């Protein structure tokens, strides 16, 4: 889940997404940032109460709105202290099984040497640490990176991310065999291949569960592995109910290991739900 923006959340959509998350046996729930609107203490308290209602396992990474917008000294000196207290470590968290490896990268910054601090930044060190972790994945594991900002601009997206270091990170992650880069920030769902390597590293963006809609209804993504394909379904809240708005099916790269993804076909399970 991502871009809930507590303090400006769509309460009905959040309640529906929470019920949905608790109703199905997801392998992992991912929160891709902007959990608060202004990084206020009361907003993080709401986030903490909400996360307590969500199923486990759960993995999270912060967004640019998760720094204290009104407290500039704290934003510069300790931008993610409030996030860490309410949610957990802001960077390099991971979930790992023989079938799945997910690692977070914190693409948000409390401040930057540019006017718009809301844009993303991934250092080369962050990228290479993530690459090294991906290289330790089990041979047949789906490899996933979760961060707030899209590493490269989404075609037709409602806004930009302008991630410094994004192109370098995308190219290195693709070379490392990453299958999915999950993000938020744009408040609109999309699936696009990154233009590197074999073209089978996919940027997957989720919508929003806030009132800050940008041309898409509040919603989240359900991501499943179906044999040698990846299915991404954008769920949308119409004010009364959740429904599948669109589904993308894209091919997954073959694995050199001894296992076979075909063994999953009989009982496909969502490995992650991204509500944003």
Q: Each predicted region: which residue ranges?
A:
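A short C-terminal boundary segment appended to hydrolase-like catalytic domains
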Residues: 225-276
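Charged helix-capping and loop-helix junction motifs
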Residues: 15, 43-47, 122-124, 159-169
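N-terminal active-site segment of His-dependent metallophosphoesterases
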Residues: 1-53, 69-70, 136
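Short acidic, glycine-rich surface-loop motifs adjacent to enzyme active sites
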Residues: 134, 138-154
